[in-house]
A protein has these predicted regions:
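Helix-loop-helix units of permease transmembrane domains in multi-pass membrane transporters
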Residues: 150-156
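Membrane-anchoring alpha-helices and their flanking helix-loop junctions
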Residues: 9-150, 163, 168-232
């Protein structure tokens, strides 16, 4: 999981956890994790416009849905319980470790917090927060001086903050996939693309040819291989 992390469970084997008492109904942990990660993202993103608040609000809703299932009510486990118990009769899917479904489904028997999908999720989430922080610093300095943001992450992609939100959400999906967050993810992607296009129209009006040259040389979300050119 998130805040409960590896420390409290590092000494327990997977088999012990499979027989543990149900690890849900922990609403304090659900609220605490939601608050910590939302405030953490807020400290990096610092929304100021209505568009910023929409993108941040959607991201926050994703986190609340995720941690509600991680610690509160395991809706996905209940909906898939018939198939899961038939396929994996030895697994107690109401234990916390079994909620790391990718580790369970791919046969990882050790502590799932050290499993390949969990480690990948840490890399995606950590990388997303680093990208979010560095992009905000560049954007803040550019806005204060009335310039177009083209340095740092903006030298590689035009929308690093939206890309950061996607990386963080993808990391949590890998760590703890749920039906609700899987359904929300493509909707949020579509919303971020729409917000990015609206943002580009506004920035183009403000900076004109300078922005058009920058946009022609810099991808929107996926960086090209190699170093950026003159847009730095």
């Amino acid at each position: 999981g998130a805040i409960e992390g590896t420390g409290a469970r590092a000494g327990t084997g997977r088999e012990t956890e499979m027989n543990a008492a149900p690890a849900y109904g922990l609403w304090t942990l659900a609220i605490l994790n939601s608050a910590v990660f939302i405030l953490f993202a807020f400290s990096f993103f610092k929304p100021s416009t209505s568009r910023d608040w929409r993108s941040f609000g959607a991201f926050s809703a994703f986190l609340v849905a995720l941690f509600t299932e991680m610690y509160g009510f395991p809706l996905t486990i209940y909906l898939l319980s018939g198939w899961l118990q038939t396929r994996y009769p030895e697994v107690n899917f109401l234990s916390h470790d079994a909620g790391h479904l990718l580790e369970t489904l791919f046969g990882w028997r050790a502590n799932p917090h050290f499993g390949p999908f969990h480690l990948l999720s840490f890399a995606l989430i950590g990388g997303g927060f680093i990208l979010l922080s560095s992009a905000w610093q560049v954007l803040y300095r550019a806005q204060r001086s009335g310039r177009l943001a083209t340095a740092g992450p903006y030298a590689y992609i035009r929308h690093p903050q939206y890309a950061a939100f996607v990386l963080i959400m993808l990391g949590f999906l890998v760590q703890w996939p749920t039906l609700l967050t899987l359904a929300m993810f493509p909707v949020l992607l579509w919303m971020y693309v729409r917000l990015a296009r609206r943002e580009e129209r506004e920035v183009e009006k403000e900076f004109g040819d300078e922005y058009r040259r920058y946009a022609a040389a810099t991808p929107a979300f996926f960086p090209r291989r190699g170093w950026p050119g003159s847009a730095a």
